[in-house]
A protein has these predicted regions:
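Extended, regular secondary-structure scaffolds
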Residues: 118-249
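Short coil/turn segments at secondary-structure boundaries
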Residues: 83, 107-108, 121-123, 275-284, ...
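Extended, non-catalytic structural segments that build the interaction scaffolds
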Residues: 28-29, 34-38, 42-60, 312-347, ...
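Extended, charged amphipathic alpha-helical segments
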Residues: 4, 212-371, 375, 407-408, ...
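A glycine-biased, small/acidic residue-tolerant capping/turn segment at secondary-structure junctions
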Residues: 393-422, 467-470
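Long, highly charged low-complexity segments enriched in Glu/Asp and Lys/Arg with interspersed Ser/Thr
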Residues: 458-488
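Extended, helix-rich architectural segments
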Residues: 1-160, 487-490
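Short amphipathic alpha-helical segments
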Residues: 87, 96-104, 256, 260, ...
Length: 490
C-alpha cells in the first residue's frame, strides 16, 4: 500500500467538507457507499474484515481477487475497438487502442472490484497517455440525472513535495449562460483550484495553479459550448445498487457474496490447518529410550527424529509404542468448499459449478464456458455492454477535446447512432471453442476470403519468419514445376 492509499480515509473526511465549501455544492455519494467501497477494496487487497491473526487462525485465499481477474479476462477476451471515418477518427482510434492494448483488462478488473471507475481525458495530445483512470476515492459526485447518469463531479489530484501537500480540485459540471441575444444556453464548465498544506488532514490555503509547475499550464476556468455529455466516462458494473438505491455508483461483483467468501476462507483455512497437523507421530515410552546409570538416574541414549516423541505417561509396560495417525477429512472439506463455491457462483451472476475445487489436482479452477451456462454468458454480456457504453462516452469526450485543441473536424463512425456496435467493437464469442474457430477459419481460407498467413499464425502457431519460409519454399516448388523441374524432367 503506497503513502496516499494509507491517508485516503483521512483525506476523504476533510475533502468532502472543504470541497463542498469551495464550490458551493453538495456531494450525493452516501457514506454507506463510501464504506462499502473501502470494504471491497480491502477484500481484494487481501485484508478482508473477517481475517484477524490475533483472534483467529483464518487466512484468506483472496478468491474475490481471482473472481475479478477471471471475469475481466472473459469480458475483455479478444476485445478490439475500431474508430474510423476521418483524420480525427484516426487520432481517437489511437487513443482508444492504446488503452485497450495496455490497460483495459486491469481497469475492468478494478471496476468489478469496487463497483466503478472513471475514464477521463487529461488534455494530453499524446495518444499513449491521454486517458486517466480515477478510482472512487479520487472523485465525488455532485449531480446526476433521473436515469442515474453522472452529470457533475469533482476530481482530486495530489502531489507531495518536500513534505508539503499539494491538492488540485477539478470540478466538471453543466451551467447556463446568456448569449448576445439574451437567450440562455447550456455551458460545460471545468473549474480548477489548487491548495497547499503542511498537513494531510486539510486542504490548507488556496494557491495559484502556476505555483505548482505540474499544473502551470492548466486554466482556472474553461467554458465549452455545445456539449451534451460529461467529458468523462463512468465504467460501472451492471448490477443493481441495493446498498443505496439513490446512488448512481455501481457495486462490486461480489458485494452480495461477502459471507460466502468468508465461509470459503474459513473452510480453506481449516483444510490447511488439518494438513499441517496431520503429521504421523510415534509415541515411545521414555523408559525404552534411556538407560539406568549410577545412582539410579536415567539418561537418554537416543536422539529422536521429529516424527517420534517420548512419553512419560499414558504408556504401560505392555504398550511401549503407540501410533498416532490423524484423521484427514479431505473429501468432506472439498465437498464443503465446492458447495460454498457453487453459492458464490450463483450470487455473483455465474452458472452453478462455474468454479470448483478439482479433487485430483487440489486446485481451484474455473470450468469452461459451455452452451448451457446461460447465467455466465448473460453476466459477461452485460459487463460487455457496460464496457461499450463507457468507451462510447469516452470517445465522445475525446472528440470534444479535439475541438479544443484544433484537430480538424471529421466524421467519427463510433458517434453515429446509425452505425451498429458490431462495426465498432469486437469481442470473442464466449460459446465458440478454439477448434470451432480454427475449422471456420480453415473453410474461409479454402474459399479464399481468409488470409493464409493469418490462419497459419493464429491457429497453427507459426511465426512470420516460418510463414515466409513456407511461402518461399512453396513458390520455388511451383516455379520449378512450371519450368519442368522438380522431377518434371524425368
Amino acid at each position: 500500500m503506497n503513502f496516499f492509499e494509507k491517508i485516503r480515509e483521512t483525506i476523504m473526511k476533510f475533502f468532502r467538507t472543504d470541497a463542498e465549501k469551495e464550490f458551493n455544492v453538495e456531494f450525493i455519494t452516501s457514506p454507506e457507499i463510501e464504506n462499502s467501497q473501502q470494504r471491497w477494496n480491502d477484500i481484494i487487497k487481501g485484508s478482508p474484515f473477517w481475517v484477524d491473526p490475533k483472534e483467529n487462525d483464518i487466512r484468506t485465499i483472496n478468491f474475490a481477487k481471482f473472481l475479478c481477474q477471471y471475469t475481466a479476462k472473459k469480458a475483455c477476451m479478444d476485445l478490439s475497438v475500431s474508430v474510423t471515418g476521418s483524420e480525427r477518427a484516426d487520432f481517437i482510434n489511437k487513443c482508444i487502442r492504446a488503452m485497450v492494448d495496455t490497460s483495459i483488462r486491469d481497469k475492468v478488473e478494478d471496476m468489478l472490484g469496487v463497483g466503478g471507475i472513471i475514464l477521463k481525458p487529461n488534455g494530453s495530445l499524446n495518444p499513449d497517455n491521454m486517458i486517466d483512470y480515477v478510482m472512487p476515492w479520487d472523485f465525488a459526485i455532485t449531480e446526476k440525472t433521473s436515469n442515474g447518469d453522472i452529470r457533475g463531479c469533482i476530481f482530486i489530484n495530489r502531489l507531495l513535495k518536500d513534505k508539503v501537500y499539494y491538492y488540485r480540485l477539478e470540478y466538471h459540471h453543466f451551467t447556463t449562460s446568456k448569449n448576445k441575444e439574451g437567450e440562455e444556453m447550456n455551458v460545460y464548465e471545468i473549474q480548477n483550484k489548487a491548495f497547499k498544506s503542511n498537513s494531510s488532514n486539510s486542504l490548507g490555503k488556496k494557491i495559484e495553479l502556476h505555483d505548482v509547475p505540474e499544473w502551470s499550464s492548466i486554466d482556472e476556468v474553461v467554458h465549452i459550448m455545445n456539449v451534451e455529455k460529461p467529458l468523462f466516462a463512468y465504467l460501472k458494473t451492471p448490477f443493481n445498487n441495493t446498498i443505496d438505491y439513490s446512488s448512481p455508483e455501481g457495486i462490486s461483483i461480489f458485494s452480495n457474496a461477502l459471507m460466502e467468501l468468508r465461509d470459503l476462507d474459513i473452510a480453506w483455512s481449516k483444510k490447511g490447518n488439518e494438513v499441517e497437523d496431520s503429521q504421523h507421530i510415534t509415541f515411545i515410552n521414555e523408559n525404552a529410550l534411556t538407560k539406568q546409570g549410577k545412582g539410579g538416574t536415567r539418561t537418554s541414549t537416543v536422539e529422536l527424529p521429529r516424527f517420534v516423541k517420548g512419553l512419560k505417561l499414558g504408556l504401560d509396560s505392555k504398550s511401549t509404542i503407540d501410533e498416532h495417525v490423524p484423521t484427514m477429512l479431505t473429501s468432506d472439506r472439498i465437498t464443503d468448499i465446492n458447495s460454498i463455491l457453487s453459492m458464490i457462483s450463483t450470487k455473483c451472476g455465474f452458472s452453478q459449478g462455474q468454479f470448483i475445487l478439482d479433487r485430483k489436482s487440489g486446485r481451484l479452477t474455473a470450468t469452461q464456458v459451455e452452451s448451457d451456462d446461460n447465467e455466465t454468458v448473460e453476466t459477461i454480456n452485460d459487463i460487455r455492454k457496460s464496457i461499450k457504453t463507457a468507451l462510447k462516452n469516452l470517445i465522445y469526450a475525446i472528440n470534444v477535446f479535439c475541438d479544443l485543441y484544433g484537430i480538424p473536424a471529421g466524421y467519427v463512425d463510433a458517434l453515429d447512432d446509425d452505425v451498429p456496435d458490431e462495426d465498432i467493437f469486437y469481442f470473442k464469442d464466449l460459446l465458440a471453442s478454439f477448434e470451432q474457430d480454427r475449422s471456420r477459419a480453415y473453410n474461409l481460407m479454402i474459399q479464399g476470403v481468409y488470409s493464409k498467413r493469418k490462419y497459419l499464425k493464429e491457429y497453427e502457431g507459426f511465426n512470420d519468419d516460418e510463414v515466409d519460409a513456407m511461402f518461399a519454399e512453396r513458390a520455388q516448388e511451383e516455379a520449378e514445376r512450371n519450368s519442368g523441374g522438380l522431377f518434371g524432367e524425368e
